[in-house]
A protein has these predicted regions:
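Positively charged, aromatic-accented nucleic-acid-binding surfaces
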Residues: 1-49, 54-180
Length: 180
């Protein structure tokens, strides 16, 4: 493990509940944690590793598609110091590979990936139009708000939230003895 690069870690928070682990390398490259990528796209924690292995062997069901899209499958370990847990090693992928995995998961119909893709496009497209018309880009708060609304609309988060609230209210009524 002599070739492990030291990196700075930060949580890339798109909106409340949608985030990935981001890493900044000394050369300025940004990378994304494999585990947080899998979870953000609605998969189990080892999905990125399995996908990379499938591409490397040429036997994965999406190996050809990912290869055509330019997926490198290069996972690089990075070392982060100064966290509450001391020094940690994290496996990371490039932003380009992260983008290709979002596309793949969306193509497979994963709601989280479809919502992430829609929300990223929604925010990005508006910023490009603002620039074209000489307007200021969205602020971070505006981006997160716009992202949340697009994400929520795609996976109907608002309906799920309403259902959760209704369930909590029913439980509170039951506990209070007002369940008749």
């Amino acid at each position: 493990m002599d070739n492990i690069t030291r990196a700075e870690r930060s949580t890339v928070k798109f909106c409340e509940g949608v985030e990935v682990d981001g890493y900044l390398l000394p050369d300025g490259e940004f990378r994304v944690g494999k585990l947080s990528t899998a979870l953000a796209l609605g998969y189990g924690k080892d999905w990125v590793t399995r996908t990379i292995n499938g591409v490397a062997s040429g036997k994965g069901k999406d190996a050809e598609t990912l290869t055509q899209w330019g997926f490198t499958g290069v996972a690089s370990p990075v070392e982060v110091t100064g966290s509450a847990r001391g020094t940690t090693i994290s496996e990371t992928i490039s932003l380009k590979d992260f983008r290709q995995l979002i596309r793949l998961a969306a193509k497979r119909g994963k709601p989280q990936a479809e919502a992430l893709l829609d929300a990223l496009l929604d925010v990005g497209i508006e910023d490009w139009f603002r620039l074209a018309f000489g307007q200021e880009q969205l602020t971070l708060e505006e981006k997160r708000d716009k992202f949340y609304k697009a994400y929520a609309a795609t996976i109907d988060w608002l309906l799920e939230d309403r259902q959760d609230i209704r369930l909590i209210e029913e439980q509170e009524l039951f506990l209070a003895g007002n369940w008749n």
